[in-house]
Amino acid sequence: MIRIGHGFDVHAFGEDRPLIIGGVEVPYHTGFIAHSDGDVALHALTDAILGAAALGDIGKLFPDTDMQYKNADSRGLLREAFRQVQEKGYKIGNVDITIIAQAPKMRPHIDAMRAKIAEDLQCDIEQVNVKATTTEKLGFTGRQEGIACEAVALLIRQ
């Protein structure tokens, strides 16, 4: 059996903290306003794999009202979500992530993001795609107020 999941996340800039995207610290003058580390890429991906396995979403599994997830490392959240997906008998077919940001530039960091995600999902790096685009200076991402991200995950029954 093959299952597809889709995830979306957005965070505004505004915190004096590192900017973490795809599990990688991206040099920038500000970080995200968020309960956890605010990693939009991993949050969207976590939602995608949870959705594909019919396990709800990131907010159900890791509620932002629970202080144990305050400033949580999103790689840990992704790994726990994937553990639950594996318990249901699924492995990764492939994942595809689109980061929507006017700034900062993502290209220099994409290979590192792919490697970390592949490690967390226990799959080959060729099963992980990360790309970035802008909104041509339109909307909140175009005004550099934050970043959005979409992700799709294909799960295969083991």
Swiss-Prot record:
InterPro entries: MECDP_synthase, MECDP_synthase_CS, MECDP_synthase_sf
Molecular functions (GO terms): 2-C-methyl-D-erythritol 2,4-cyclodiphosphate synthase activity; metal ion binding
Protein origin, superkingdom: Bacteria
Matching PROSITE patterns: ISPF
Cofactor details (free text): Binds 1 divalent metal cation per subunit.
Swiss-Prot/TrEMBL catalytic activity: 4-CDP-2-C-methyl-D-erythritol 2-phosphate = 2-C-methyl-D-erythritol 2,4-cyclic diphosphate + CMP
EC number(s) from the headed UniProt entry: 4.6.1.12
An example Gene Ontology biological process: terpenoid biosynthetic process
Pathway recorded for this protein: Isoprenoid biosynthesis; isopentenyl diphosphate biosynthesis via DXP pathway; isopentenyl diphosphate from 1-deoxy-D-xylulose 5-phosphate: step 4/6
Residues carrying the site annotation Transition state stabilizer: 35, 134
Binding locations of a divalent metal cation: 9, 11, 43
Pfam family, one: YgbB
Chain residues that bind 4-CDP-2-C-methyl-D-erythritol 2-phosphate: 9-11, 35-36, 57-59, 62-66, 133-136, 140-143
Cofactors: a divalent metal cation
HAMAP family: IspF (MF_00107)
Protein name: 2-C-methyl-D-erythritol 2,4-cyclodiphosphate synthase
Function statement: Involved in the biosynthesis of isopentenyl diphosphate (IPP) and dimethylallyl diphosphate (DMAPP), two major building blocks of isoprenoid compounds. Catalyzes the conversion of 4-diphosphocytidyl-2-C-methyl-D-erythritol 2-phosphate (CDP-ME2P) to 2-C-methyl-D-erythritol 2,4-cyclodiphosphate (ME-CPP) with a corresponding release of cytidine 5-monophosphate (CMP).
Gene encoding the protein: ispF
Keyword annotations: Isoprene biosynthesis, Lyase, Metal-binding
Similarity field: Belongs to the IspF family.
Description of how the protein assembles with itself and partners: Homotrimer.
